[in-house]
Amino acid sequence: MTVTDIASRTYNHGWRLDPIVRSLLDTDFYKLLMLQMIREFYPDQKVTFSVINRTKRVRLGDVIDEGELRAQLDHARTIRFTKKELIWLAGNTFYGKTHMFSPDFLAWLAHFRLPDYELHKADGQYELHFHGPWTHTTMWEIPALAIVNELRSRQAMKGQGRFALDVLFARAKAKLWAKVERLRRLEGLRLSDFGTRRRHGFLWQRWCVEAVKEGLGPSFTGTSNVLLAMDNDLEAIGTNAHELPMVAAALARDDDELRFAPYRILDQWRQTYAGNLLIALPDAFGTKAFLRDAPDWVADWTGFRPDSAPPIEAGEEIIAWWKSKGRDPKQKLLVFSDAMDVESIEQIHHRFSDRVRLSFGWGTNLTNDFVGCAPDGSVDLDPISLVCKVTSVDGQPAVKLSDNPEKATGDPAEIARYLRVFGDAGRVRTPVVV
């Protein structure tokens, strides 16, 4: 465990560049899992990722200095996987499996570097895009989000006094520990850290992970952050993301291919991985549509990660679907990770813990909850909803419908086409906070 006085480090910061990303392992585990599959099945696809600020009231172009942002992005492009990191990836056990990553893939990673970026301002917001092979642009998602979020945090803390910073972090620590004390009461809880992309900062995420590891003991099952998993001897947690069905759908040549696209890429996933990595993310084009058209073999997968539908409703719908397929929900796994916090974790746990295997991914509300902690009452450290999504594939626009229309992304004409193919059933508009 590394003990850092975060307040002192923040106050004394005076370096020309304090790198936000210092390792290519400072990313979510599922990025590496997906990357290995992408390289196998989609080595030549050109995919653009774009950073999107859904919290429009926060004008990031006015908050973050462009020179500082470019310096951090440029620094990230200089980083390579180290020998130590590659040896750990080669020799560690993930999800009970040794040699998760092939020697060929690890040899390729040894020469990996992040591709170039495109950055400019428009109407008080940054437009940040990453163009190139999917095998490279996919790896920008997490570091780009972490960089933007931490630069915003640093700006909000600039000029604060030594003791004001002490109070800020003391309040945030006490707030987190109060959550831990509540979560301890949940029998059989299984919870992991999913908070890298929208964290306050790396040092704070590390403190949170170490605190929850001590506070929850065996109930804390690991972290999605590969670097923190390696450094803290934790399980690296993660399966797959929306980018897989989004890319597969954008490559579809007609409506029939579009309708089947989510299952085609899941079939490729199951050719690559097995066991507890067979977790389906059903909401890219609507959960009801996914369950309606799903091949029978999807019911044999380990479980689902409901992401954008109201969690209780989504859980009930999936349990009913398993039963309709003759499967026992008690043998299946539900992973809840959308904007989870203590209250929602408690509610979901009480509702489902005796009916299905449960796991929780605790994200922004673990690693970036400074709401009400600033001594001056500022809201500049309140988290925002920042995402980095696929926006085009081989020149074709990419779409995400989501169970919540507020989270939909893509060209309006393409969204209309996708709605015609998948339908609008079950989509409910709710405010997006994080």
From Swiss-Prot:
The keyword Phosphoprotein applies. Keywords: Ligase, Phosphoprotein, Pyridine nucleotide biosynthesis. Its EC number is 6.3.4.21. The modification Phosphohistidine is found at residue 242. GO terms for biological process: NAD biosynthetic process via the salvage pathway. SUPFAM superfamilies: Nicotinate/Quinolinate PRTase C-terminal domain-like, Nicotinate/Quinolinate PRTase N-terminal domain-like. This is Nicotinate phosphoribosyltransferase. The lineage of its organism: Bacteria, Pseudomonadati, Pseudomonadota, Alphaproteobacteria, Hyphomicrobiales. The gene is pncB.
